[in-house]
Regions:
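Beta-strand/loop substructures that line and gate deep hydrophobic ligand-binding cavities in soluble
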Residues: 373-419
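A conserved amphipathic terminal alpha-helix motif
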Residues: 290, 294, 408-436
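N-terminal Rossmann NAD(P)H-binding glycine-rich loop of SDR-like oxidoreductase domains
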Residues: 2-27
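Conserved beta-loop-beta element that borders a ligand/cofactor-binding pocket
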Residues: 111, 132-162, 166, 171
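Mid/C-terminal beta-alpha module of Rossmann-like enzyme folds, strongest
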Residues: 4, 195-261, 269-329
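NAD(P)H-binding glycine-rich loop region in Rossmannoid oxidoreductase-like domains
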Residues: 37-102, 112-119
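Substrate-positioning beta->alpha
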Residues: 91, 155-156, 175-196, 204
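Glycine-rich portal/gate segments that line the openings of hydrophobic small-molecule binding cavities
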Residues: 326, 332-380
């Protein structure tokens, strides 16, 4: 029987990419999250064992760690606000102790890249001290300290994406001239996977980055070039951290507490000083920054997006995610799925091919249409019909990927009308389904 792998922080970004790779490699996977039902929208949900547990409640850890060979520690507490450093260290120590008792053979931890001997932000210091807390136990720990991670859905990349798309002139403090060594998210996953099979990395700390060193402002300018946008960076002598985190929280998908911690972490260089990882894991072939951006942009489609919003917590949501503005609605319909889907196809026919073309169709379940309207961005509308415990549910999701400032203005200025139209649309589909 394949060894059991535990992935903590399963609702997070890295875990969402790591778990499919583990499953594809034939591993048995168990996920650990405080609220496992938030994972229901993930494609792999039914192929893994899901255990509710919280490192801040040590008594919950034993069931999650029982029978585990290797555990990935992908937990952070940035969203919890002040005092997160103490919580992260306490949680890591509790996990290390519980892993030792459970007989876990290996812990793999993903942290952040900074010089621990230099002047670094509380966020980066917390990442380093979390690794030290995990090593407090007797279970061997492999720690990867990553520079800026580039990939669709990465917090760092989404900050770059949304701010560069929105602002013709991007303001930034002096540290925007600091150096980083951005690494493609697929290479991060490559390293995390390689640590499972390559015993030479056990018990070591590795700094990981991509093949290029670039200033933070250059990352935005290169993104703009690949998107065909004309952008400038304006270096400002001083911008208060609270003001920057407020702006990032407003303009991007990154919540303000996380933005506050993350921006503080950008105030220093993030480059690899010790490249032993290249010798220990030569099987990992590094991807260039431009290629990483192009891969991320190629995923700008509803067919590739991670459905983090599809859970049991609310049936109407608007959010920013992976380059999209998203309007999500879900209602219960008193009709069979086939009848609901028949009404959906009639509505789609009414729109006509001049307005929309069919992107994806799964009979009686899913219809995804791509907009052909001339707008400053790309749009899709998707309907899904599902049968859950003798009840039929209809979900309607609108995706809009803005291109440049005009795309943002288009979405926000039409907000009042958009809300009315999308509400009317799903309600009419439901109403017509019941009289079909």
């Amino acid at each position: 029987m394949a060894k059991l792998i535990l992935v903590t922080g399963a609702t997070g970004y890295i875990a969402s990419l790591l778990i499919p790779r583990l499953l594809d490699s034939g591993r048995r996977v168990r996920t650990m999250a405080r609220h496992p039902l938030r994972l229901k929208g993930r494609n792999w949900f039914h192929y893994v064992e899901n255990i509710p547990a919280d490192v801040m409640t040590p008594s919950t850890l034993a069931p999650a760690l029982h029978g585990v060979d290797t555990a990935y520690y992908l937990i952070h507490s940035m969203a919890s606000g002040q005092g997160y450093t103490e919580r992260e260290i306490a949680g890591a120590r509790a996990f290390a102790s519980a892993a030792e008792v459970a007989g876990v053979k290996h812990i793999i931890y993903l942290g952040g890249l900074a010089d621990p001997e230099g002047h670094i932000s509380p966020h980066m210091l917390s990442r380093i001290e979390t690794g030290a807390a995990l090593r407090h136990g007797r279970v061997p720990v492999t720690e990867f300290r990553a520079s800026v991670i580039i990939g669709s859905g990465s917090i760092s990349f989404e900050m770059i994406r949304f701010m560069t798309e929105l602002l013709p002139i991007v303001p930034g403090p002096a540290w925007i001239n600091n150096n980083s060594q951005p690494i493609a998210v697929q290479n991060v996953i490559d390293y995390l996977m390689a640590a499972l099979d390559n015993p030479n990395g056990s018990g070591q700390v590795f700094e990981i980055g991509g093949p290029e060193i670039a200033q933070y402002k250059d990352l935005m300018m290169r993104y703009a070039r690949l998107r065909g946008l004309k952008r400038r960076v304006l270096v400002v002598s001083y911008i208060p951290l609270w003001f920057m985190s407020f702006g990032v929280g407003l303009m991007t998908p990154v919540p303000r507490p996380i933005a506050h911690a993350l921006i503080g972490g950008l105030s220093h260089h993030s480059i690899v000083k010790h490249d032993k990882v290249l010798r220990v894991f030569p099987e990992v072939k590094l991807v260039s920054f431009d290629e990483a951006i192009q891969i991320a942009l190629a995923r700008l489609s509803p067919r590739h997006i991670e459905r983090v919003w599809d859970d049991d917590e609310g049936h109407t949501k608007t959010l920013k995610h992976e380059g999209f503005f998203i309007d999500y609605r879900k209602i219960k319909v008193s009709a069979e799925p086939e009848k609901v889907f028949n009404v959906i196809t009639k509505f789609a026919d009414h729109f006509g091919t001049r307005q929309f073309t069919v992107d994806t169709v799964e009979p009686d379940h899913l219809l995804l249409l791509r907009s052909q309207l001339k707008t400053p961005g790309e749009g899709w509308i998707e309907w899904q019909v599902s049968r859950i415990v003798n009840s039929t549910y209809l979900t309607q999701t609108v995706f809009f990927a803005p291109r440049g400032t005009a795309g943002f203005l288009y979405w926000y200025l039409l907000s009042p009308f958009r809300a009315i139209i999308f509400y009317w649309l799903i309600k009419n589909i439901a109403r017509n389904s019941m009289v079909e």
